[in-house]
């Protein structure tokens, strides 16, 4: 009996001495309990926080959106074969989206040590129950808490909620047209920003580089390395641009500031039919346009051909070279070069390996004294010409069709199909984890349909016509052929009469001389 009393008193003392112990800070209420899942579990308030705090609206962020997608997929049974371990692994991977390593490690620790609570919240029937796990793991921040920190404890209003959750809707309906900025405001902001960057580079280059690189850490583990590599490649030319040019010039090159017109370009407008008093000075390229641009194009074209035809001057090589030469001329002259090749290629083939560039351009009437460019309607060829496909003309037509034809045939190769399949599966990797398996399964099942669709779309003839490489015969524009000037040009000289097929007309009606005397003229 004495032993029983001693045992009873000992148990009673132990029970009175050790109640359900909780940390002292838990007495501060839900502000402390619901900071995260660890604090709620320590204060034994997980259910309270889940129903009263964590299910409330949250601030929009990338980690929060990814976590909510994963939680919704786990709770709705998108992958019915997933085990509890698979679900916890998916949730733990979302912790890697947090910006700092410390917060990411704490999130993973909470998932690992409070897995039962995480699975319990994911098994909830309500959508708010599923999303509450993201707030518990600090992947989502409660909207009320965010506003309390940024507005000095000011109570939440509907205007504040609109500003945080959907700032683009707070001032009216969504518009895809940006609001009009005051004139010069963008230029002023650009100049101010470039000036600050130049000051930072001059004062401390290492600090500026480190500051820029630190921004990559907020992009998540998958993109941080790519971001840093990009910055390393772009930082040196950006630094040279910033240090070598004044802020105004940098912003003008970027299109943020309008280019100032020089005072000598100012001209007085004509009034009542009186011509302008000051003539505008044209730019260099405009002077070339007025002083025989077509002749310059021809000379550049033939000189480039000479460089490529030193060892071999066959007609096949010349024709092939004509298709490539327009890629090396200056950008403003590319279109004129293409037109030149289409129109004058037969004459160039005949003359290329025999005469100098100046003689070539002079012979086909592109260079010379007061001669304008003309379009020759017939080729001066001594050999019979091959039949021409009326619908597939153009210097790049055959090359375009050969290229696309080979590409279409390569679609049947196993290696090409494997590369296409890997490319499509690579696109699946950017999706949230629950959808990756479904995307890969879709690509594998529909691979034959995708390949056949690509082959159907890559019809060489149709694609080359759409790109303009193949086209029908082009009619010379009125005014580009000197022969349309009539007898005043035909009968100017025997060469002009022969060129315009009007030798007999000039002899009979204008010159009224025998053919023998005409041929004797110099």
Curated annotation (Swiss-Prot):
Function: May activate the lysosomal degradation of sphingolipids.
Protein name: Proactivator polypeptide-like 1
GO cellular component: cytosol; extracellular region; lysosome; membrane
Keywords: Disulfide bond, Glycoprotein, Lipid metabolism, Repeat, Secreted, Signal, Sphingolipid metabolism
Disulfide bonds: 64-140, 67-134, 95-107, 187-257, 190-251, 216-227, 295-367, 298-361, 326-337, 397-470, 400-464, 428-439
InterPro entries named in the record: SAP_A, SapB_1, SapB_2, Saposin, Saposin-like, Saposin_chordata, SaposinB_dom, Sphingo_Act-Surfact_Prot
Glycosylated residues in this chain: 204, 312
């Amino acid at each position: 009996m004495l032993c029983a009393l001693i045992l009873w008193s000992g148990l009673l003392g132990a029970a009175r001495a050790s109640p359900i112990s909780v940390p002292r800070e838990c007495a501060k209420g839900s502000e402390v309990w619901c900071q995260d899942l660890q604090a709620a579990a320590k204060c034994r308030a997980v259910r309270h926080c889940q129903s009263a705090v964590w299910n409330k609206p949250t601030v929009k962020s990338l980690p929060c959106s990814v976590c909510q997608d994963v939680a919704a997929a786990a709770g709705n049974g998108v992958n019915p074969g997933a085990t509890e371990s698979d679900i916890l692994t998916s949730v733990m991977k979302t912790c890697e989206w947090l910006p700092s390593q410390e917060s990411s490690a704490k999130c993973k620790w909470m998932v690992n040590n409070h897995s039962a609570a995480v699975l319990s919240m994911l098994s909830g029937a309500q959508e708010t129950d599923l999303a509450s796990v993201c707030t518990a793991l600090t992947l989502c921040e409660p909207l009320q808490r965010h506003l309390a920190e940024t507005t000095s404890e000011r109570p939440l209003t509907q205007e504040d909620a609109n500003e945080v959750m959907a700032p683009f809707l707070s001032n009216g309906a969504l518009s895809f047209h940006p609001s009009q900025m005051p004139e010069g405001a963008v230029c002023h902001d650009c100049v101010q920003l470039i000036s600050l960057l130049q000051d930072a580079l001059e004062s401390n280059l290492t600090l500026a580089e480190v500051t820029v690189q630190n921004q990559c850490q907020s992009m998540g583990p998958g993109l941080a390395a790519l971001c840093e590599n990009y910055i390393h490649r772009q930082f040196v030319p950006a630094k040279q641009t910033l240090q070598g040019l004044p802020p105004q010039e940098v912003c003008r090159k970027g299109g943020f500031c309008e280019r100032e017109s020089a005072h000598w370009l100012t001209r007085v407008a004509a009034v009542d039919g009186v011509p302008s008093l000051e003539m505008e000075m044209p730019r260099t390229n405009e002077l070339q346009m007025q002083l025989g641009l077509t002749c310059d194009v021809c000379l550049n074209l033939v000189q480039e051909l000479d460089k490529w035809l030193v060892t071999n001057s066959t007609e096949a090589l010349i024709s092939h070279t004509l298709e490539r030469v327009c890629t090396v001329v200056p950008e403003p002259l590319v279109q004129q070069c293409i037109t030149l090749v289409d129109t004058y290629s037969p004459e160039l083939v005949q003359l290329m390996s025999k005469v100098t560039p100046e003689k070539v351009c002079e012979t086909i009437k592109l260079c010379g004294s007061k001669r304008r460019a003309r379009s020759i309607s017939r080729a001066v060829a001594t050999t019979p010409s091959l039949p021409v496909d009326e619908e597939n003309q153009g210097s790049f037509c055959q090359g375009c069709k050969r290229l696309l034809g080979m590409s279409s045939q390569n679609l049947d190769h196993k290696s090409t199909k494997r590369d296409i399949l890997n490319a499509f599966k690579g696109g699946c990797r950017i999706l949230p984890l629950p959808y990756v398996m479904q995307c890969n399964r879709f690509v594998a099942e529909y691979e034959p349909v995708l390949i056949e669709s690509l082959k159907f779309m890559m019809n060489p003839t149709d694609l080359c016509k759409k790109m303009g490489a193949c086209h029908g015969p082009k009619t010379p524009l009125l005014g580009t052929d000197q022969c349309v000037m009539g007898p005043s040009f035909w009968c100017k000289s025997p060469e002009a009469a022969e060129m315009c097929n009007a030798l007999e007309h000039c002899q009979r009606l204008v010159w009224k001389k025998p053919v023998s005397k005409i041929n004797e003229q110099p």
